[in-house]
A protein has these predicted regions:
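Membrane interface segments of multi-pass transport proteins and intramembrane proteases
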Residues: 156-167, 171, 235-246
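Loop-to-transmembrane-helix entry motif
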Residues: 24-32, 127-134, 138, 208-216
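Short, hydrophobic/aromatic alpha-helical segments in well-folded domains
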Residues: 20-21, 122-123, 187, 204
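Short cytoplasmic-facing helical segments at TM-TM junctions of multi-pass membrane proteins
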Residues: 197-209
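Alpha-helical membrane-spanning segments of integral membrane proteins, especially the hydrophobic core
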Residues: 82-95, 118-146, 166-175
Length: 286
């Protein structure tokens, strides 16, 4: 089954799907993939903050030095750069394990919206079995986001570009990342629900964009709006350190992680229901 909708109809559908997903916030089983990802993000955060601990210093101290310079090794400087350090660590965690969380969530949401819920473990096993496909299918977009978010701004800064140029580059990178996110969210349904491989997934994307692209844009924008205020909290790290409570920055980054997971929950559920409604069987509940 495939249903064609114009742009306005897709916007209305996106709103309906986001509301339907919000009504699922209290279902613990749907949170399991994100809780696992959150634990991994938390471990990365604690390892960065506690890089000097004997258990991890052999690996983490050189890593912190490479990413933030030798000054970060002196207390409490690491907390000044902790949000930026964790953003880089989170990128790696998301690239390797976040794709499994997305895949599992897609499978769980699809079953829930079809009125045939499955255990969280089944969703995780299903996604883990397709880990390689999910990883490779998402990898080109992950690399583009890496270049836009970190590579270009750092290259301009190394060249001594003006503040205006840097801000414009960051703004352009933000817009580019949003466009990439629109394509990004379409991959998991093709892999997990349509059962496509990497090559077929990328072949199918151009034909999928006209069918659900407007809805995907709306969902990506809302998720970005939800996530944006929390990501701006990183700017307060210096102020927190200067006021003599550097360890509170760990809590600040933890808030960023939690909000990002909520945004990911909303995105995965909404795009899954959009896909079911326009491409696959929407199920009894919808």
């Amino acid at each position: 089954m495939s249903v064609r909708m114009n742009g306005f109809e897709q916007l209305a559908l996106a709103g309906h799907c986001m509301l339907a997903t919000l009504r699922q916030l209290g279902r613990g089983g749907l949170w399991v993939p994100w809780m696992v990802l959150g634990i991994l993000q938390g471990v990365a955060l604690l390892m960065l903050a506690g890089f000097a601990h004997p258990w991890v210093s052999v690996v983490m101290a050189p890593l912190v030095t490479w990413l933030a310079g030798a000054d970060a090794l002196h207390y409490p400087n690491v907390f000044r750069v902790l949000p930026a350090l964790h953003a880089r660590a989170a990128f790696v965690v998301d690239a390797l394990f976040g794709v499994v969380a997305i895949g599992a969530a897609t499978r769980l949401f699809a079953a829930r919206f079809a009125n045939q819920p499955i255990p969280a473990g089944d969703g995780l096993r299903s996604a883990a079995g397709r880990w390689w496909t999910l990883l490779i299918a998402h990898l080109p977009l992950q690399l583009l986001v890496l270049g836009l978010s970190f590579g270009i701004p750092e290259w301009l800064q190394a060249r001594g570009s003006s503040g205006v140029t840097l801000r414009l580059a960051i703004l352009a990178g933000f817009g580019g990342a949003l466009v990439i996110q629109v394509i990004f969210v379409m991959i998991a349904p093709l892999v997990m629900l349509a059962g496509l491989g990497v090559r077929d997934t990328w072949r199918e994307l151009p034909s999928l964009v006209p069918k659900i692209g407007v809805a995907a844009v709306a969902i990506a924008v809302v998720a970005t709006v939800v996530n944006f205020p929390a990501q701006m909290l990183g700017r307060f790290a210096d102020r927190i350190v200067d006021r003599g409570a550097p360890e509170l920055v760990i809590g600040l980054v933890a808030i960023q992680v939690a909000v990002a997971l909520v945004a990911a929950f909303l995105t995965a559920g909404s795009i899954t229901l959009v896909y079911q409604s326009l491409i696959g069987d929407p199920g009894d509940e919808w």
